[in-house]
């Protein structure tokens, strides 16, 4: 994928992170792309919904699955402003998503290499491609209030 496209989609994820910030949530945003088009977007709603599972990645997976009428997101990619936690990494693996693009790393709960790496565990029946370093500075800046 061309860098400009990657930045375009990460900017869309950052717009979602801003929505989370405005709701006093941890400012994380995610978008799911299929065939070069955004099919789902979401931001953290854990505080708003009083539900620890309402992470941006989970919500985006749910929206994309509903839109595609399938839990298998094999031809989809996700752009995430913050490295996913183990819960979200598990959901990404189970959704069969093709690839994820990560902005900022998470040294507290990151499950794509910062704390542990579920995506490199070859015992799972699906392998998610991971690309890190997309608009890192902007994604880190979106987290400053934490």
Task: State each model region's role.
Residues 1-23, 71, 84-144:
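Zinc-dependent deaminase
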Residues 4, 27, 47-55, 83, ...:
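Residues at secondary-structure transition points
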Residues 28-33:
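Short beta-strand scaffold segments in enzyme catalytic cores
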Residues 39-46:
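Short beta->alpha transition motifs characteristic of CBS
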Residues 43, 55, 126, 145:
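Histidine-centered active-site/metal-ligand motif
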Residues 46, 80, 104:
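Residues that line or immediately flank small-molecule/substrate-binding pockets and catalytic motifs
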Residues 54, 58-93:
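Helix-adjacent hinge/juxtasegments
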């Amino acid at each position: 994928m061309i860098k400009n496209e990657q930045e375009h989609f990460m900017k869309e994820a950052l717009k979602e992170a801003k929505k989370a910030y405005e709701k006093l949530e941890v400012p994380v945003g995610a978008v799911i792309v299929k065939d070069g088009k955004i099919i789902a977007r979401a931001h953290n709603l854990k505080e708003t919904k009083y539900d620890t599972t309402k992470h941006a990645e989970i919500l985006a997976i749910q929206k994309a699955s509903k839109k595609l009428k399938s839990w298998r997101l094999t031809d989809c990619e996700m752009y995430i402003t913050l490295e996913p936690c183990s819960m979200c990494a598990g959901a990404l693996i189970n959704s069969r998503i093709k690839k994820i693009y990560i902005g900022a790393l998470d040294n507290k709960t990151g499950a794509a290499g910062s704390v542990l790496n579920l995506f490199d565990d070859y015992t799972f029946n699906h392998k998610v491609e991971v690309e890190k370093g997309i608009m890192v500075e902007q994604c880190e800046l979106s987290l400053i209030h934490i």
